Amino acid sequence: RDSNVTILPLRNMKD
């Protein structure tokens, strides 16, 4: 679950 929360912000930066 913690991994998912870290990917959320990462994906926003990529967009």
From Swiss-Prot:
EC number: 3.4.23.-
Keyword Ubl conjugation appears in the UniProt entry: no
Top-level taxon of origin: Eukaryota
Known tissue expression: Highly expressed in the placenta between day 60 and day 100 of gestation.
Example of a GO MF term: aspartic-type endopeptidase activity
Enzyme class label: hydrolase
Record: glycosylation sites: 4
Keywords attached to this entry: Aspartyl protease, Glycoprotein, Hydrolase, Protease
Gene Ontology BP, a term: proteolysis
Family: Belongs to the peptidase A1 family.
Protein's UniProt name: Pregnancy-associated glycoprotein 66e
Annotated source species: Ovis aries (Sheep)
